[in-house]
């Protein structure tokens, strides 16, 4: 980790509860990141905060630290079964990741977290909640289910967190969020925090209706995409696109990379060619069962898979370290998704590489993306003669519950030729 990624403010300089501080120090957290340095002095003082910073800058630990501190220092129904904090996320994967990140603080403080998300695990989640939780982490739909059934009451809530708030609004969760917030104590009687990599004025205005005179903090990046991310753009024909991807993978030799495409079927095509070419590759799309998703992410995080092919379900909030490369096989239709996609690399002060394809189908999305990020993406040329020959792709068998979403190989690669890139 690069030293200039951190601020000059130490966690020990903050008025943190001693159990929270001890947990952070034991984990090796000494200096705050910039977003933590700006937001924590306010949230620890009980002020509502809306924080905007790029992905991988410590937003999750900023609101978790404030949440645990608040529950430990404020009067409340300690030891009760109903939650005292509510953390809402737009996706199941992000909710699970937040819960995992909270583990170091739950272990040190004795506070309990519980998960509430759709898809599967209903009975397991219900059992944990009925045994009593201090912090409920989940997606809006499942939390509303529990509230309407009378399983969860929100009248004891002291802290509310909306993570990736703009995404929650974009996905149409405004009514759900407001329903849940109306079940909580009034804004004046709770701490409310918003965090996201992008936070539009419209979203900020809507969100602030349910906050108490919030402070807005922003870490202004040198550029929206992060100055440690090397960006590169190719203009392949549809015919060359897959061969170019395979050639670049062999030339770049990424230690760990994510390849984004806009549709499930396109992701499956990419997975098929990469698996046939001997890559250790996983497939993450919206229809993959939750248990399988978590298994794939675990394999990817632990290094058993080198490549993850995904739709934008993986672009938000997932804390996967050491992703060296991101490929935009398709340019996203939403310009903000470009920022979130390539934000999977260059995290926590490390460098990263982003390679995008402006093909015949999605090149029209490029002007809006470059306008949003306020710079042109450097263009490279490729030598058609240097492209690899495509293997016969694997195909996913439909209707087979045991069909694999990952492929493993012991293949040792030999770089076949140079692509002769010209910048």
Swiss-Prot record:
Enzyme class: hydrolase
GO cellular component: cytosol
Protein origin, superkingdom: Bacteria
Catalysis performed (reactions): ATP + H2O = ADP + phosphate + H(+)
Keyword Cytoplasm included in the entry's annotation: yes
One BP term from GO: RNA catabolic process
Residues holding ATP: 53-60
Domain spans labelled Helicase ATP-binding: 40-217
Role of this protein: DEAD-box RNA helicase involved in RNA degradation. Has RNA-dependent ATPase activity and unwinds double-stranded RNA.
Subunit description: Component of the RNA degradosome, which is a multiprotein complex involved in RNA processing and mRNA degradation.
Protein name: ATP-dependent RNA helicase RhlB
Lineage of source species: Bacteria, Pseudomonadati, Pseudomonadota, Gammaproteobacteria, Pasteurellales
């Amino acid at each position: 980790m690069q030293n200039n990624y951190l601020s000059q403010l130490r966690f020990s300089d903050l008025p943190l509860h001693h159990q929270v501080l001890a947990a952070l120090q034991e984990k090796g957290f000494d200096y705050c990141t910039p977003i933590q340095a700006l937001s924590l002095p306010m949230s620890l003082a009980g002020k509502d905060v809306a924080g905007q910073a790029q992905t991988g800058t410590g937003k999750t630990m900023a609101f978790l630290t404030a949440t645990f501190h608040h529950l430990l220092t404020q009067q409340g129904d300690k030891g009760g079964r109903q939650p005292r904090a509510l953390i809402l996320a737009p996706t199941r994967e992000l909710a699970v990741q937040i819960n995992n990140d909270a583990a170091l603080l739950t272990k040190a403080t004795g506070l309990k977290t519980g998960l509430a998300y759709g898809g599967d695990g209903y009975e397991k989640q219900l059992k944990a909640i009925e045994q009593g939780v201090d912090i409920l982490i989940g997606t809006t739909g499942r939390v509303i289910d529990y509230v309407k059934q009378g399983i969860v009451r929100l009248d004891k809530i002291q802290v509310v967190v909306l993570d990736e708030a703009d995404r929650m609004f974009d996905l149409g969760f405004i009514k759900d969020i407001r329903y849940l917030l109306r079940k909580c104590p009034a804004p004046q009687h709770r701490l409310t925090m918003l965090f996201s990599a992008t936070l539009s004025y419209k979203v900020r205005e809507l969100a602030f209706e349910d906050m108490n005179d919030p402070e807005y903090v922003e870490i202004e990046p040198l550029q929206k995409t992060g100055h440690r991310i090397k960006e590169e753009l190719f203009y392949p024909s549809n015919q060359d696109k897959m061969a170019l991807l395979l050639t670049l993978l062999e030339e770049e030799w990424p230690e760990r990379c994510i390849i984004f495409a806009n549709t499930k079927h396109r992701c499956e095509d990419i997975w098929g060619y990469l698996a046939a070419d001997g890559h250790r590759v996983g497939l993450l799309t919206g229809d993959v069962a939750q248990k399988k998703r978590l298994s794939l992410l675990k394999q990817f995080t632990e290094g058993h898979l080198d490549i993850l092919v995904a739709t934008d379900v993986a672009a938000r909030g997932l804390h996967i370290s050491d992703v060296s490369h991101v490929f935009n096989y398709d340019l996203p239709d939403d310009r903000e998704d470009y920022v979130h996609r390539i934000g999977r690399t260059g995290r926590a002060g490390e460098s990263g590489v982003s390679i995008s394809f402006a093909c015949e189908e999605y090149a029209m999305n490029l002007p809006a993306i470059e306008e949003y990020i306020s710079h042109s993406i450097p263009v490279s040329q490729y030598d058609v003669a240097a492209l690899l020959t495509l293997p016969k792709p694997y195909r996913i068998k439909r209707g087979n519950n045991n069909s694999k979403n990952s492929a493993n190989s012991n293949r040792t690669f030999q770089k076949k030729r140079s692509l002769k890139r010209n910048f």
